[in-house]
Each structure stands twice: as structure tokens, then as C-alpha cells.
Amino acid sequence: MIVPMKKVTLLVLGSEQERSLQALRSFGAVHVQLRECASEQLAELHALDARCVQAIALVTDAQTKNVTRGEECRVAGQVVEAAEAVEQIVRTHSDRVELAQRIAQCIAHLERCEPWGDFDPADVRALAQRGIHLIPVELSERSYRCLPDELQTLCLARRGGLVRCVLVADKPGLPPSLPADARALELPDVSPADLFVRLRQLREECATLTQRLLAYSEYQGAIRALRQKIAADIEFERVHLSMVSVDVSQWRETGETLRIAHVSGYLPVSRVRAFSECARKEAWAYCCVDPMPEDPVPTQLRNNRWVNLISPLMNFLGTVPGYWEVDISGFFLLFFGVFFSIIFADAGYGAVLTLVSLGGIVLSKRKHAVVSPAWCLGLYLGTLTMVWGALVCNWFGVPVQYVPASLARIAVWEISGFADAAQRNKNQMHVCFFLGLLHLCLGHLIVVRRTFRSLRVLAEFGSLLMLGGMYVVVLNLIVDKERYPLTGMIVGSIIAGFVLNFIFVNYRVSVRQSVADSMKNVINALLGIVNVFADVMSYIRLWAVGLAGGAISATVNEMTHPLFANFLAFLGIVLLLFGHGLNYVMSILSVIVHGVRLNTLEFSNHVGLMWTGIRYTPFRER
């Protein structure tokens, strides 16, 4: 359920802002309505947090010796603050980057000078001061033969059609008569031999900095703790900046101005009494009212332990219903489990998930830790997958004739591998379409409950009629035309449903105004019939993805079966595990794409759920 909220406005003395905010944070139940704000302190906190992220990224691959979770760590016998460690890590990395650039430059100079042998550029510069300019030049042999006679050259080497020579000139710079393909050597500041020495020194310095950076790997715990503190400081600063100060009056005796600061937020109704006691204790003034539809009210979901199993998936997706919308967590959990089982469609895969989840639960209990809802969700999904896989008699893609009789007796003949393939597929598609009809009708029934006192409820009854008619149309097209004919009653239900939906879907004040609003969007209204057909048809994806996964499992078994008859049995086991593991991962991705979509798109559209909610994040100690 969505927890009801109250909008609260808090008023405090301007001189008591920080103390009041600390008390409000200790209370820990008010979701503060933040404003767009900026300050120098906030910018510094964000910059420090960015440096912490950079520092963790720099040392995360280093070998961690002793991860310390305090605010201080010891490296090389010296205790330093975590913030100082961050600065040292960033500075060390900056020095490494600078050294890497110098090493790259040194290597580039060596590569250019290597064909010219060892020489001392200082001698060349000394001769240039005496008026003798030596210019190392590389050019093609043909261009070398065509050099003018007035150019004095000394040929050093001929290799690969290239000539390396030295031009002797009485002034600096390349002569204008030199061919276009001639390239002069850029002289380094020292000799190649000295470059080698410099390169070795730079690499040693870089290795030293690398070891120093590796030593900071034990700071990761401290830096993460520092990030948590920074996050709390950022939140406090943003709330502080969101408080609006107003000058109320001025004392005649002292001339001091009385300033009042106020901030707004949202509070669960169940905490209003506790907030009132806190306000009385802290001498606050406050106003507590019901939120308006235009207010950005946060959404807090509170469900029982069973429905709360879906929370890991909802947190992963980041989907939150709006405060004024409906919570479908229970229906989401129920149908997501069914869709999961049909997409996996393998009792063996379900057994693996069940055993892994049970192992996680047992391990958590042995450690006296709280069992994560993710393990319970895995147990629920694995159990449903085992049930559906047993009904269709699919155990790791093994042909039904090799399945033990005790397991084969569990199967439902019409939808299992014992039936004819064509008929089995039609029956399974029929099951998927029926689930789709049930799923979408349930969505409209939820809306019926919310709009029962309004004529708009007739639009939902019209949608139900269209869904029923389109369900038969889909069965006629996909499953069996003779068994599911398109009678006049079916067509009439679709038309009647469309008329009811068209007239009352925009009902607010009067039927006439509702029809007028529908006429403005008549094209979208007509396309709505197609959308209903597409939504029912969309549930065929459950059968299609499950069929594909079963085919992959069977193919993997057929490919590896011959290997078990000879000495390649070990290779067969490896390929079997790899193939089924890959299929398992692909099935998980299919669930995320298809199983989640049917809940968050098709079902949500029929409920009128837009997932535009703001997660309830109270201002509290972290």
C-alpha cells in the first residue's frame, strides 16, 4: 500500500537554523522538498566526493592487504586522515600521468634517433655556434641523387630506398632547394645514450609511484566511509539552502531584525503525533495539511512480508508509483512469478534457482544475519518455475521419453511434450492468452474499484467488453478458427465496449463534455481498439521465449551427447555446463525484457499507472 502523507511546513528562528536542522535530521521522518540551490560549500563537497570516487577507482584493482573501516589508516607507519589519503592518491596518480607522458616523449625521441645511431646533440649545437650547421635529413634515394651541387651532404646510410645524410650549411634552417620528401630530424636535448638512462630513471620513478598507489588500496574502506559522511553533509547543506529566510520585524530597542526560516516537506500520517512532540520540544512552529494533487508528494510503499519479496526487483528497476496512483506490488509479484516460470519453462532450471536460494537463506541464518528478500524472491520464482516445468515435462531439455516415470506422471498431457507439437504449441499459446486476458481485466477492475462512484466506471466496463472480444479474435487467428468463431456477439461486444469507452473515458462533469473531449482525440480513440488487440497478442511472447529456451536446451543436449560415448566425456561435461549456463543467462535477460515489460507497460497502461513517483527519502542520519 501507499502510505498516506501530510504536507508539513516548519518555521524556526533564523539564528536556530542549523540546530533545528540537526534536530530534524535526528527525528528522521520528514521528506524535505528541496529547491534548486548552489553554494561554495556545496561545490566543495561535490568536488571532494568526486575526488573520493576517483581515488577508489584508482586503487580498486590494487591488491588489498588490510581494509580498514575507520576514518584513519596506517600506511608505511604513518597515520593520515582519509581525506588526506584521497588527496595523496589523486596527487600520486597525477604524477604518474605526468611521468607516463615524459616516458612516451622519451620513447618517441629514441625511436626517431635509433636509425641515426648514437650522437651528441651538444656537439651539433656547438658547431652551429661557430657557423657550421649540421642538419640530419632523410629522403628517398631518387631525391638524393637529384640534389643540387651547391648543397654539401655527407651520406650516412642507405636502406630500403631511403638515404640518411647530413646537410652542411652556413645558416640554420632547411635550404629552399631541398626536395619536398626530405624530412629533417628533430634533435633531442641529450644524446640517445642519455635518453636511455633518462628512460630507465623515469620508469623506476613510475614503478615507485605505482607501488605507492598500491599501498593505498587499504584505504578503500576509509574512503567509502568518508563518502558516506560527505553525502550526509551534502544532504544537510542542500536542506539548509532550501530553507527560505524572511525578515519579520525589527526590535526598536536594539535595532535587530527578527528572521524566520521555513522549509516544507512531507511526513507519513503515522508520524504526525511524534513530529508534534518533537516540535513542542524544540520550540518550532509548524503547519500540517493534506497535500494537493499538484504537490510533489513522495511515495512510501509499505507491504506485508509476502508482497515485500518484489522489492529487490522494484529497487533494481527504479520504478515508483505516483502518490496519487495505485500500488500494484502484490499483482506484480504474482504475475511476474508466473511469467518467469513460463519464460524459463524448465523444471531443472527452477530446481537450480531453488537450491541456490535455499543455500543463501541457510547461510544467512547461520551467520545470524537478516535474510535478504532477494533470496526469498529467488525461492518463490524457482518454485513456480519447477511447477510449470513439471507440468510441461521439461527437465533440462531432456526428451520426454527419457524422463523418469514419476516425473512424467506430473505433466499435463495437453501442454507437455507428450502431445503433438502443433497441438501442444496451440494449447500453450492459449494458456498465455488467457493469462493476458486475466491480467489486463484485473487492471481494469482495479480502476473500476477506484471510479465506482463516477460514470467513468462505464468506460472501464467498455474496456472489459473490448478485451473479451479481442481475446476471442486472437484465439480465432492464432489457435483455432472453428473452435473460436467470430460471431455477431463477439463483434457486438467489441463495438459496444468501444462506444462505452468513447463516451465515458473523459468523463469529469458531464457526458456532453466527455464526448466532446473524445471527439478531439477520435483518431487515438480508434487506435485504442488496435492497442487492445496488440496488448492481448503481446502475451504470446511468453510462449515464444519459453519455446526458444527449450529448443536451445535440447540442442545443447544433442550436441554434447556423442561426446559422452568416448574419451571426450570431460569436454562434453564442460560444453554441457557452458551451454545450459548460457541459456540460463539468456532466460534471465528474457525475463527482464519480457516478463517485466508485461507488468510495467501493458498491465500498467490498463491500470493507468505512469510510474512517475518520487521515492520517499526522509532527511535522517545515514
Curated annotation (Swiss-Prot):
Family under the similarity heading: Belongs to the V-ATPase 116 kDa subunit family.
Broad class of the protein's primary localization: membrane
Name of the coding gene: atpI1
Annotated GO biological process: vacuolar acidification
Membrane-topology annotation of the record: Multi-pass membrane protein
Sequence intervals crossing the membrane: 306-326, 328-348, 373-393, 428-448, 459-479, 485-505, 532-552, 562-582
UniProt keyword Acetylation, yes or no: no
Gene Ontology CC terms, in alphabetical order: plasma membrane; proton-transporting V-type ATPase, V0 domain; vacuolar proton-transporting V-type ATPase complex
Record-level Gene Ontology MF annotations: ATPase binding; proton-transporting ATPase activity, rotational mechanism
Keywords: Cell membrane, Hydrogen ion transport, Ion transport, Membrane, Transmembrane, Transmembrane helix, Transport
Record's protein name: V-type ATP synthase subunit I 1
Biological function: Produces ATP from ADP in the presence of a proton gradient across the membrane.
The keyword Transport is assigned to this record: yes
